[in-house]
């Protein structure tokens, strides 16, 4: 198994519910280390740019509106097989289909307000991390 970095967003619905700490604790208990984290209020331009791959899909405008409706936490997580581990912790995109005990099953209310975003591949992680963080903002976590 290789040490990887992945990208995570704690979305506006979860921030509004004050479950930032509970979600981050789940990452850490699963062996993922936070190597960068910040709270940001996305502009329409930033949200549209981040989700540009979905720009032709019917839900794009609603997604951008939701992601700009309140602050989010953007994080870089590091650990063994971080991309897959984060995806497993999040659960299915639709919280009604998410396994019990996953972040989305516990904190999300709908497929639209589904608490978290996580990279789906190492390539996506690299692109998403670079979208929000400079190399100097990523901290080595040796211990």
Curated annotation (Swiss-Prot):
Q: Does the keyword Iron apply?
A: no
Q: Where is the active site?
A: 117
Which of the seven top EC classes does this enzyme belong to? transferase
| Xref: Gene3D superfamilies | Nucleoside diphosphate kinase-like domain
Annotated GO biological process: CTP biosynthetic process; GTP biosynthetic process; UTP biosynthetic process
Which InterPro entries did the record assign? Answer: NDK-like_dom (IPR034907), NDK-like_dom_sf (IPR036850), Nucleoside_diP_kinase (IPR001564), Nucleoside_diP_kinase_AS (IPR023005)
Family per similarity comment: Belongs to the NDK family.
Q: What does this protein do?
A: Major role in the synthesis of nucleoside triphosphates other than ATP. The ATP gamma phosphate is transferred to the NDP beta phosphate via a ping-pong mechanism, using a phosphorylated active-site intermediate.
What is the name of the protein in this document? Nucleoside diphosphate kinase
**Biological source species:** Ectopseudomonas mendocina (strain ymp) (Pseudomonas mendocina)
């Amino acid at each position: 198994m290789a040490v990887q970095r992945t990208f995570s967003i704690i979305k506006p619905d979860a921030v509004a519910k004050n479950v930032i700490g509970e979600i981050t604790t789940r990452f850490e208990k699963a062996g993922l280390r936070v190597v960068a984290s910040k709270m940001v209020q996305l502009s329409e331009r930033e949200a549209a740019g981040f989700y540009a791959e979905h720009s032709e899909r019917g839900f794009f405008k609603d997604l951008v509106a939701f992601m700009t409706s309140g602050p989010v936490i953007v994080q870089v997580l590091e650990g063994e097989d971080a991309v897959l581990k984060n995806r497993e912790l999040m659960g299915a995109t639709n919280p009604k289909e998410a396994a019990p005990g996953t972040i989305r099953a516990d904190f999300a209310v709908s497929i639209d307000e589904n608490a978290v975003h996580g990279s789906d591949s190492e390539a996506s992680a690299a692109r998403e991390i670079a979208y929000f963080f400079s190399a100097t903002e990523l901290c080595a976590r040796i211990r």
